[in-house]
Amino acid sequence: MGDTVVEPTPLKPTSESTPGPAGSNGGSLLSVITEGVGELSVIDPEVAQKACQEVLEKVKLLHGGVAISSRNSPLELVNGDGVDNEIRCLDDPPSRIREEEDEMGATVAVGTAKGARRQRQNNSAKQSWLLRLFESKLFDISMAMSYLYNSKEPGVQAYIGNRLFCFRNEDVDFYLPQLLNMYIHMDEDVGDAIKPYIVHRCRQSINFSLQCALLLGAYSSDMHISTQRHSRGTKLRKLILSDELKPAHRKRELPSLSPAPDTGLSPSKRTHQRSKSDATASISLSSNLKRTASNPKVENEDEELSSSTESIDNSFSSPVRLAPEREFIKSLMAIGKRLATLPTKEQKTQRLISELSLLNHKLPARVWLPTAGFDHHVVRVPHTQAVVLNSKDKAPYLIYVEVLECENFDTTSVPARIPENRIRSTRSVENLPECGITHEQRAGSFSTVPNYDNDDEAWSVDDIGELQVELPEVHTNSCDNISQFSVDSITSQESKEPVFIAAGDIRRRLSEQLAHTPTAFKRDPEDPSAVALKEPWQEKVRRIREGSPYGHLPNWRLLSVIVKCGDDLRQELLAFQVLKQLQSIWEQERVPLWIKPYKILVISADSGMIEPVVNAVSIHQVKKQSQLSLLDYFLQEHGSYTTEAFLSAQRNFVQSCAGYCLVCYLLQVKDRHNGNILLDAEGHIIHIDFGFILSSSPRNLGFETSAFKLTTEFVDVMGGLDGDMFNYYKMLMLQGLIAARKHMDKVVQIVEIMQQGSQLPCFHGSSTIRNLKERFHMSMTEEQLQLLVEQMVDGSMRSITTKLYDGFQYLTNGIM
């Protein structure tokens, strides 16, 4: 089927040339579907039919004399210039010619040639429709992942690999675990389609390079050791770590005495978003420095890191840009492993503070916190604020990290180190000019610091010497009296629209706030994290900023992260993706369910980092510290039943409880004791620790048999079984399940792709995906779904296994 064109003799538009009625000779033998290509009434059906026959004869000669049925010929009538008409034979026709059964349709060839030809024609038609889908506005990253995973056609896979460049970076980043898992475990055609995009993005972003290197290592660990060494994933990981994907033609950023343009900008007045201009900047800026072979830090690199740099010319080459960050992460992981050997929480906490104090001697450096969503440099870890979290066998810990936000991580100079005793506390940025420090001086504070492209120097900046910033002493008698609220006052004064609030409302809200301020937890040696987690985040930020030598800088930010050693976070990452997808679906369908997915960084098959949920403590900590029921705690924190604060917190509780009940049902989340359910300051509940999902359960006992955890205490907060909020809860459950099943494929494909080549416990058994699909109940009517929700809610409330599991956790781990 080439692109043969037949140009029939021009026709005179006479009255006889109009098509006859159905059933006349040739009137129904040709049915042509056109889309905006002209009128068909100017062509006599008999002439058109004869032209079709001529085309078929030519095609028959081209195919070696094989007779071709006109039924299967993808012919399309095209009006080219509005006057002359032509019939064109297309390889990829947008529509098919349908003809009635007649003598011509009966003339068909026999044998294998006919079957092969029909297969080619069918494939051609399918590819035409597929191309239309790929080029339509409906084609999103979710569809691309589905076709990339399910299609067996190399052409389709290659096309989708190219289409990845058209999607937003954020959209593709969400599916990065799926892309890399397919690259590792699927056939070569899929890998070839994916690799150009991965390489391109690694050249653009150092954070993307780190994510790829970590995930490739983690997902390759399920392979046999002999296969793993020579796998595509291992080779790509070595390529990334060897720094061969570092942006080419980067120019060295020379030290300048002029103020750095990004230092004087307030990061709060701009939104950080990667774009093509950012990528261009990261490619065009930076430098190539000569590595000194005598550097003991380079010579003592671990075996893995040194093996990744074998291809680099030691005499003159760019330093490995990922080396400082990997060293920083390795230091945090080593601390966690050493803490696990200590017997008591108190000893672990003391050791953690000492270890982080030593770590501070290497900061600031060209390192960053991968869980953050903006470019920055780490400058300090307030070591006295770190806490060890509850764990029976391991020692996960929570740290706070001070960073300075920047426009571009690669090209911005590493901030100079400010000693703890070189600065006096200043409580607001706006008072600095009055205290003798002008805006220009602050903007240029770090302008004399060179760009640390030699990352070994950037990581070990102990001997800063002359680069340290000397700030004049500040007299606190005039500066410290300036309130931080002055910024808010100025902002409100700039508003042109008057805001009218009734005096009675002001008095009522003030009295409620004074009467029901959030309570503080008492310090518990067995649970040191409770006090730290209960403190409001904004209060913690203010307190740490006041005591930090970097706190006066306008681009100062405080981040937090949980470091975990000895735990496989790949299942946590899978759960995060499913929660994020469900959150997007419910927002799209306008169902007011509330869930809080938190970021996961997989470092290896047994370590990682987790983004903490701020302003939240576990229900176990709430009950242990307050010695109150959940409802009484709500009344203590938010006021009486009729207050605005209580009603708002109750609504938040219901919306979040319904959302997480659906999550727990769809993913079959287990190990739901009160230590794994958080309660935030606004009344939401947040489930954490998704180590047991789908086919796995604690100790493989399958102890928790209810669809989700719904205790009597939860129902009491909702107002009881007869309350309006409890009915609202069940209505949200139904709406959420209906919305989720409309987009079932988006959820299922996330899990299905990650099952490829995986040895994770959640995929044990051959029916994991089938059971997941069945829980969406695609064949049920909405009335049947409503009955199902009623049954699940009733069964979960009355579940004896939930009560037994809570009792088991109390007896073995002391979890209330």
Curated annotation (Swiss-Prot):
Biased composition (Polar residues): 278-297, 306-318
Residues modified to N-acetylglycine: 2
Any one annotated GO CC term: mitochondrial outer membrane
Keyword set, alphabetical order: Acetylation, ATP-binding, Endoplasmic reticulum, Golgi apparatus, Kinase, Lipid metabolism, Membrane, Mitochondrion, Mitochondrion outer membrane, Nucleotide-binding, Phosphoprotein, Transferase
PROSITE patterns per record: PI3_4_KINASE_1, PI3_4_KINASE_2, PI3_4_KINASE_3, PIK_HELICAL
One GO MF term attached to the UniProt entry: 14-3-3 protein binding
Domain PI3K/PI4K catalytic positions: 535-801
Subcellular location: Endomembrane system; Mitochondrion outer membrane; Rough endoplasmic reticulum membrane; Golgi apparatus
Region called Catalytic loop, residue ranges: 668-676
Activity regulation (UniProt): Inhibited by wortmannin. Increased kinase activity upon interaction with NCS1/FREQ.
Region annotation (Interaction with ACBD3) ranges: 2-68
GO biological process entries: inner ear development; phosphatidylinositol phosphate biosynthetic process; phosphatidylinositol-mediated signaling
Quaternary context: Interacts with ARF1 and ARF3 in the Golgi complex, but not with ARF4, ARF5 or ARF6. Interacts with NCS1/FREQ in a calcium-independent manner. Interacts with CALN1/CABP8 and CALN2/CABP7; in a calcium-dependent manner; this interaction competes with NCS1/FREQ binding. Interacts with ACBD3. Interacts with ARMH3, YWHAB, YWHAE, YWHAG, YWHAH, YWHAQ, YWHAZ and SFN. Interacts with GGA2 (via VHS domain); the interaction is important for PI4KB location at the Golgi apparatus membrane. Interacts with ATG9A.
UniProt protein name: Phosphatidylinositol 4-kinase beta
Species for this entry: Otolemur garnettii (Small-eared galago)
